[in-house]
Amino acid sequence: MTRVKRGNVARKHRNKILNLAKGFRGAHSVLFRTANQQIIKSLRYAYRDRARKKRDFRKLWIARINAASRQNNISYSQLINQLKTSNILLNRKILAQIALLDGPVFSQIVMESNS
């Protein structure tokens, strides 16, 4: 088998990894091996946290709706149940935005769901 000189290919590969590791702390942005390990770890974190972000936002929306609904003397679960039974099709994201930015409109929605 003939010898393959990988000078350019290996350097290009290492530079690609080191460019991805820009902004990392300490040796993680300078040394190839630690940078490579950190890149793998950071990609894993990014994948995991893309799913976690959806959970966290849903939790935040529910907390905001719950706080606003309790100001209107109704619990979150009762409000959601009444919205479903009265066929008011507002998702949690929109309800949370209304509760945060426009309290009187949220109170009207609660009143509509009661009737």
From Swiss-Prot:
Span of the signal peptide: none
Gene3D superfamilies: 6.10.160.10, Ribosomal protein L20
Pfam families per record: Ribosomal_L20
Location of this chain's protein in the cell: Plastid, Chloroplast
Keywords: Chloroplast, Plastid, Ribonucleoprotein, Ribosomal protein, RNA-binding, rRNA-binding
One GO process term, biological-process aspect: translation
Record carries keyword Plastid: yes
GO terms under cellular component: chloroplast; ribonucleoprotein complex; ribosome
InterPro entries per the UniProt record, alphabetical: Ribosomal_bL20, RIBOSOMAL_L20_CS, Ribosomal_protein_bL20_C
Superkingdom field: Eukaryota
Molecular functions (GO terms): rRNA binding; structural constituent of ribosome
Protein family per UniProt: Belongs to the bacterial ribosomal protein bL20 family.
Function noted in UniProt: Binds directly to 23S ribosomal RNA and is necessary for the in vitro assembly process of the 50S ribosomal subunit. It is not involved in the protein synthesizing functions of that subunit.
Name of the protein described by the UniProt record: Large ribosomal subunit protein bL20c
